[in-house]
Amino acid sequence: FLPILINLIHKGLL
């Protein structure tokens, strides 16, 4: 998992 994808997912959830 890339940090960028995780960041986008977190922004989406938040």
Curated annotation (Swiss-Prot):
GO terms for biological process: defense response to bacterium; defense response to fungus; killing of cells of another organism. Expressed by the skin glands. GO terms for cellular component: extracellular region. The modification Leucine amide is found at L14. Keywords: Amidation, Amphibian defense peptide, Antibiotic, Antimicrobial, Fungicide, Secreted. It is found in: Secreted. Antibacterial activity against Gram-positive bacterium S.aureus. Weak activity against Gram-negative bacterium E.coli and C.albicans. This is Temporin-1Lc. It comes from Rana luteiventris (Columbia spotted frog).
